[in-house]
Amino acid sequence: MIPIVEVPQTIAVQMNNYRDIFCRSEGFDHVNRYVTGLIISPNKTLQGIYDLQVWEGNKPSRRSMHGSVFEYGWDSTELMKQHRVFVSPSHKGQGREVISLDWTFSHHDRGPEIYGNKKEYDYVEGCTSRFQTVVTAVISNDKLIDGLDVVVQSPNLVESELEYLRMTAQDSYEQMSALQDRLLELLYHQKHKLEYKKRTDIALEMVQQIEQEGLFCEAHYAFDNGVLTLDLTRYIESQGKHWVSEIECSRHINWSGEWQRVDTVAEMLRTEHSESFRHIKVNCRNGETREHWVFTKQVRLKRYGRKRLVIVYDTSDLSGTPRYYLTDALHWESVRVLETWSYRWSSEIFHEFGKQVVGMESAQVREEEAVKRHFRLSCVAQSFLQRATVGESKSERFEFSKGKATIGQRCRKIAREVLRSMLELCKRLFMEGKSTDDVMGMLMPA
């Protein structure tokens, strides 16, 4: 735990690209310090980050920092627009770039009043818990993974409200005030029903915004069957881009003039025409080369039309459960389809990175705007950390990386900058004749 005397240069230089988003310089400084805390503070709540701050002179209150970061002075939507402008040059001319669409759960078991936090069954953990559903759009090449947008899905209250309305319904109302209250309840129910967006709706809006800005002209899309919708695929195709998606085994395709489940077709091919599966080698995003046995063919699906299907086995004897991939790129070979699909897992890395390193699910704020700001600042901090330049480490703990910069080294580099500024302050205060107790009182008040 290192006191933060000033914003480290690595963060300050990159945050200057976002200066126009913030009105007041004092508020901008609070946000800079908050982003720094998201990276180096062990407690990534606002209280934990504020406790590390050191100001010379009058120290701003925690309420002042809370207001600057979560309540006023800037727009988180504009922040993400500027963030996409900031990261876009790093993805041009760097080989294959793919935008992955996905969602994750941000758990808050002790925060029932946090915006978007609902108690439901968590199919990942296999139990009931409280969590927010966070939809993400992530772009990646073979070196960088950057979040393009992060949106918290609002809770679906329609069913519970409808049940309440049914239970409290009356045949008649004797008082006008009671009738007015009932009318308001009905109007609010209709309002919430119209405002609610499914995860697929949010993903489509993200793609529409990204394509309208035109910053990632060469990036295709990858997503799993939970995001796959007709509206999404049609929009991507209308922009002259391609998509790759995994599909469920129950999806029906037109095979020999009949509509059949894709797993039925795969089993028939495996048992009767095993020679139709071709051995290929795929160079994945992480540098690994994987061997697969694949069958690919153009097929027709209901509503989606003609697409390319790829059936994948991992063993030469075609044992195990196959995977099924679909793409609108009819001219792509199976190798290119699977290489593009390997970039879909960048979103999983982004989620894990965000939760473990930059505090994506650490905030305890309740209001909708505050929750959005925290997630989006975590997204910005993640990109900053990847761009921190580090030299070759002489420490034994990083020998395993064989000269390749790790996230731990980048965090350490920023922490060293924070430590250096603290030592410089201590040096100056001691030269001014301050006692050890005076310096301790400034750095870590009792």
PLM feature spans:
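Conserved, well-structured functional cores that handle cations and Mg-NTP chemistry
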Residues: 1-263, 295-298, 310-311
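A short, flexible helix-boundary coil/loop motif
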Residues: 1-29, 38, 54-56, 154, ...
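Extended, non-catalytic structural segments that build the interaction scaffolds
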Residues: 33-34, 316, 320-345
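Short amphipathic alpha-helical "interface-anchor" segments enriched in bulky aromatics
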Residues: 101-105, 270, 333-365
